[in-house]
Structures are given as structure tokens and as C-alpha cells.
Amino acid sequence: MADPRKDAFATTSKTIIKNLERAGMEGYFCETSADARELVKSLVPEGSSIAWGGTETFKETGVKEMLEAGGYTMLDRAKATTPEEQRAVYLQHFDSDFFFMSANALTLKGELVNIDGNSNRVACLSFGPKHVIVLVGMNKIVKDTEEGLKRVRTIACPPNAARLHTGTPCETVGICGMCHEPGCMCCNTVITRHNRHAGRIKVILIAEDLGF
């Protein structure tokens, strides 16, 4: 049975991809997570080093599992046993071949909207890895950056805070309080409107609800 939401998203994606290309980024459309996995396989040569930021979409699409089972070097910070080891892995991320992440929101103009706590994710988006692949579900499309920032604080952060047990208003009240708590997830806001190194950032639009 046809899904009108997916049909509408497919149409909207054409506009977004055109705007991404104008901004020096590559844009792709996939109907399903399975299609996205096949696309990633075609974009990422075997033997590449793989890093990723905090992203549920990377796991939900099955892309992470696929890469772990393939011939890739996975730079997994979760395997670090000390703060020193974790920092070393974070630094390796900057020199990785491919960095995977999602976006908190993506505007119709092709602008990536991200708010980060630890901020390794937005740091690698901005500089370092040879390629950045951004996996974006259709639930993250917004009209403009203002709507994108609102989406982060009202839709994305509360469940993410609950997942991470931050102890911030996002978790305890269910809405962003623009706090200065130790577990604050809203430390750095990055809006990516242009990519100077053409093709470095590749955005894959997936016609599914993914991530937060």
C-alpha cells in the first residue's frame, strides 16, 4: 500500500538534494534503510577507517552492524577502558576516512542543524575526517533553522536525555530548560550551510522515521 508521507518526502527530497549540491554537499535519497545500506556499501571502500558520533540512526538503519561485519577498521570509543584511551580514540576520529552521524534537523534549504554536548560530533562534521556521511530520517526535515533549533529542544533532546540519564530538565521535566547543568546536551550549536571541500559531506535522506 502506498504511503503518502513517503511519497511527499520523496518529492521534498529532490528540492533538498538540489540545495545540498548548491552548498557543496552531496545528497542521496533512499526509500528504506536497506537501500541506505547498499548505498553506503557503494560509497565506502573496504579497508576504510570508520568513526561515528552519538547517533541512534546509525544503529537503527543497520549501517553500523553492516560495517562491523565487513572489512573495515572500526574506531569504536565504547571499547576504550580509560578516559585516556577514550580521548585517544576521539582524536583518531579526526583522521578517519569516514565519519558517520545523523543531524538533529535538516532544513529545506539543505542546512544541517546540530546541537551537541560533548561536541565531538559537530567537531568532526566541521573539520577532520576525509568524508562525513549524514544519515537523515524523514522525521528530521524542517522548514528553516529556527524550526530546526526548536525541534532539537522540544523533540530530540528530551528522549535523548532520558536515554543518557543526563539529569537535566530535558530528562526530569521533559523540555529543554536552557540549563547549565553538568550533563547539559546543548553546549555547542552548529549550522552547516556550506561545505568548502566539495563532496566531503554526503547526506543520505531515508524515507523512514529514524533517531530522535
Give residue spans per PLM region.
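N-terminal active-site beta-alpha-beta segment that forms phosphate/nucleotide-binding
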Residues: 9-90, 95-99
